[in-house]
A protein has these predicted regions:
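Short boundary motifs at domain starts and secondary-structure transition points
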Residues: 11-21, 141-150
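Active-site and donor-binding regions of nucleotide-sugar-utilizing enzymes
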Residues: 115-177
Length: 177
């Protein structure tokens, strides 16, 4: 799993992994101000995300009935919050994802589920979050799968006013891969 590291400046966000210092990792940045420098950086980052990543404008939105139905058709209705179950589900659901990335994703997802349990979330809530994250992964982030684990990681540009707790869970999982 990749570690989350802090950027010393915005241009760090475009560096390949090998140029990110002694402990390479991923960046998770929220910009809350505007300047000509930020505008220029965002244009470069936007182009990088367009070429090799995902651009999300506005919130992701809940999966619709058709998407949930397809998820259930493909994976069944069973759910177990453990890495083996999630890795097996990802084999069917995300065929372009490498086995190593399936394992990393499953471990990161289980870490997030464990954190939710510690906060008092029920199994039903955790199952619903699992279904939501799996739908988002398939319908919004599938394009990232071939690039995960590369020296030049995919970019995610998320343009919105506020990120929901569930969206943060997915972004956190992806940042740990």
């Amino acid at each position: 799993m990749a570690n989350r590291i802090n950027a010393s400046n915005l241009s760090d966000l475009l560096l390949p992994m090998r140029q990110r210092g002694n402990a390479p990792g991923v960046y998770f940045v929220r910009l809350c101000q505007w300047s000509p420098e930020i505008k220029d950086f965002l244009w470069r980052y936007h182009e990088a995300a367009r070429a090799k990543g995902v651009i999300i404008e506005g919130q992701i939105g809940n999966p619709d009935e058709r998407q949930l139905s397809y998820l259930t058709e493909m994976l069944g209705s069973a759910f177990e919050p453990n890495p083996a179950f999630i890795t097996q589900a990802l084999q069917k659901w995300m065929p372009r994802m490498s086995q190593a990335n399936r394992v990393s994703f499953a471990e990161a997802m289980c870490d997030q589920m464990d954190e939710l349990k510690r906060k008092g979330k029920t199994d039903s809530i955790i199952r619903n979050i699992y279904m939501k994250v799996m739908c988002w992964l398939y319908y919004k982030f599938e394009r990232l799968m071939p690039f995960l684990g590369d020296d030049n990681p995919p970019r995610i540009l998320y343009e919105c006013n506020a990120v929901t707790a569930h969206e943060l869970i997915l972004l956190r999982i992806l940042s740990l891969m």
